[in-house]
Structures are given as C-alpha cells and as structure tokens.
C-alpha cells in the first residue's frame, strides 16, 4: 500500500527545520548504503549521528505520533531515527531496494524495514526533477509532494529519485517496523479502521460499530507481533 500522508508538519515547522538543517554539515550519501546502492547513489546527507539531525528527527517522530492517518496505516512499533538528504546539480539515486534489516544507530537494536517514509521539506516549485519513483505490480508511480507532506510505501518496493536539474530537493527519510509485518494484512486493517471511523462519525457508537471495532482489534490481536 502506498499512501500520501498530508500535513505531517506545519508550514512554520518546515521553515524552522530548514533553518536548522540548511546550515549543517552535509556529507556524501554513499556512506549510508552498501556496495550495490553506492553504484547508483549521488546525493548528500546529514551524518547518521548528527546532533542536528537527531534533534530535528525527534520533532518529526513526535508529529507523526499525533497523526491519526499515519498511525492507522503504519501501526508503528519501532522507528529508524529520521535521516536527511539533499539533491541538487544533477544528483540522483538510481533504482534500488532498501535493506530488509537495519541497525538503529547509537543502540543495540535492529529494525525490520516494513515501511519506507519520505517527508518532503522543499516545495515542488523550488526544484525541477527529483521525483520519487516507486515501482510495483501496477507500474511506476512518481511522487512530488508539498513541503510537510509524506509518502508512505512498502520498503520492499524498488524505487529511485530522478535527477534534480534545478534548485535543491531536501527531505527526511526513514523506516518503520510495523506491528503487522505483512503489507496485505496491514492494508486490510487500515481500510477497516478508516471505514469504521467514517461510520462512527455518522452513526455514533451504535451496536454495529462496537461489533466492527471488536473485529478490528481481534484481527490486530491475531496478526500483531509485539
């Protein structure tokens, strides 16, 4: 399931984050990928343990924790601390797939990468090119969202970032381990939850809504790994 999560950050939050990270030290993005990814990756990033990146990353995770659409879709259990990248002057990242398991920097924990997240920190009119292209069984999907919006998609997807030919594309990216590893099951739970919320707004907590809510939680109880 690929999902647009709007307004993760307010316009004011984006401005403050950009002020903070634009003046930070950026390094070659190849430092964070394996040999295969390094062949097709041309960008810059904040270092993984950058104090600036860690501080801003916590602000992003706090915002996500209060975003009901994200929580419903991702059913998050564990997060990779958000990273930050910058593309300009023709920089790009060719087709690749994210690693299935990553070590969480600064800890002894690992994370199964169920979901990939890209949070846009540049407005679309600030740069040319730079679309995130995600390939699945239905074809290729190009994504270029307003600053503060995020795209959520299965980490198993092959994807790339098109060359940025003008301006700068700045974003945050990270991975989520979900309570429900299977994308199909997670998608069913998301659709059920969204429909329950819509019906509840119209009908209130009637007997049928309570029954459907019970079915949702029974399925989650059966499928969740916590």
Curated annotation (Swiss-Prot):
Keywords: Dioxygenase, Iron, Metal-binding, Oxidoreductase, Vitamin C. NCBIfam families: PRK05467.1-3 (NF003974), PRK05467.1-4 (NF003975). Residues 78-178 form the Fe2OG dioxygenase domain. Binds 1 Fe(2+) ion per subunit. 2-oxoglutarate binds at residue 169. HAMAP family: Hydroxyl_YbiX (MF_00657). SUPFAM superfamilies: Clavaminate synthase-like. Its cofactor is Fe(2+); L-ascorbate. InterPro entries: Oxoglu/Fe-dep_dioxygenase_dom, PKHD_C, PKHD_hydroxylase, Pro_4_hyd_alph, Pro_4_hyd_alph_FE2OG_OXY. Gene3D superfamilies: q2cbj1_9rhob like domain, Rabenosyn, Rab binding domain. Transmembrane segments: none annotated. Pfam families: 2OG-FeII_Oxy_3, PKHD_C. Fe cation binds at residues 96, 98, 159. One of its GO terms (molecular function) is 2-oxoglutarate-dependent dioxygenase activity. It comes from the Bacteria. Its EC number is 1.14.11.-. It comes from Janthinobacterium sp. (strain Marseille). GO terms for biological process: DNA damage response; intracellular iron ion homeostasis. This is PKHD-type hydroxylase mma_3618.
């Amino acid at each position: 399931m690929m999902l647009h999560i709007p307004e993760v950050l307010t316009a004011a939050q984006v401005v403050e984050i950009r002020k903070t990270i634009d003046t930070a030290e950026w390094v070659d993005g190849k430092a964070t990928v394996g040999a295969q990814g390094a062949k097709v990756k041309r960008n810059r990033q904040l270092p993984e343990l950058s104090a600036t990146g860690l501080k801003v990353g916590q602000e992003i995770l706090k915002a996500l924790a209060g975003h009901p659409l994200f929580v419903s879709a991702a059913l998050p259990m564990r997060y990779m601390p958000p990273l930050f990248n910058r593309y300009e002057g023709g920089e790009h990242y060719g087709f690749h797939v994210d690693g299935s398991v990553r070590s969480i920097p600064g800890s002894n924990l690992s994370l199964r990468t169920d979901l990939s997240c890209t949070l846009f920190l540049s407005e679309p009119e600030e740069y040319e090119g730079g679309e995130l292209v995600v390939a699945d069984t239905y074809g290729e999907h190009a994504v270029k969202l307003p600053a503060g919006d995020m795209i959520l998609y299965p980490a198993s997807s092959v994807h790339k970032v098109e060359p940025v030919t003008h301006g700068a594309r700045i974003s945050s990216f990270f991975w989520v381990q979900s309570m429900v590893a299977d994308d199909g099951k997670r998608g069913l739970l998301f659709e059920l939850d969204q429909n329950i919320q819509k019906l509840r707004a119209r009908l209130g907590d009637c007997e049928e809504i309570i029954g459907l809510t019970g079915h949702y939680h029974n399925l989650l109880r059966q499928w969740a790994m916590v």
